[in-house]
Amino acid sequence: ITSTPAAYLKLHLLSHGLTRPNSLNLDGIYAALPNIAWTSEGPMALSALPEAMLLARIEGRHLEVTSVDKFPKLTNYVVPDGVRIADSARVRLGAYLGAGTTVMHEGFVNFNAGTQGPNMVEGRISQGVFVAKGTDLGGSASTAGTLSGGGNHVITIGEDCLISANAGTGISLGDRCTIEAGLYITPGTQVSLLDEHGETVKTLKARELNGQSDLLFIRHSQTGVVQCRTNRQAIALNAQLHQHN
């Protein structure tokens, strides 16, 4: 990306659902997008903001600066069909939201990230992460992105998964996986694999389970050991919450 119009075009293609996350080359987007004051009177260059605020006070108007950022909020430009967004400031332009998606107040969706729909989002979907249909991100749940920390593995979350409250993942999940509340799975996390009798079969790093389906990640309440066994109960979203968006 070498120009601001090209950057905005690609963000719109994503948010209009014409292309999915990670399908466009977004290299250079940060350099191409200027830092903007997003205000109640529209976007403004930062250099023009002090004069605009002073003029508003003189004229008895209130000029609200909702953010200072390179990315505007999604709903200033695009409102996808069939979605609910409880707090529009939590979803950036460039997010991909499939029909039936609900983003609650503490949910967050970055650009070049999103959901297939229907989905419940009460946690954070980082840049580059795509979540398949039927999956629930619990309150303050987290998915590892590639913008900081040196990681370059793009995370995908399969269908009918549950990342419980305050949990998170730095590996991709297949379908019907569950991570218990408060447990963050990083690629280097030591995981004990359990058989159907609850006996440890082997211990490995979580990255070796990357993308596999039907896994249940739990932490032993006495030893703190992270364990993984077959997930025998896939989650199901509350249809009433998503069919009438």
Give the label of every model feature segment.
Residues 1-76, 207-245:
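Terminal amphipathic alpha-helical/low-complexity segments used for targeting or macromolecular assembly
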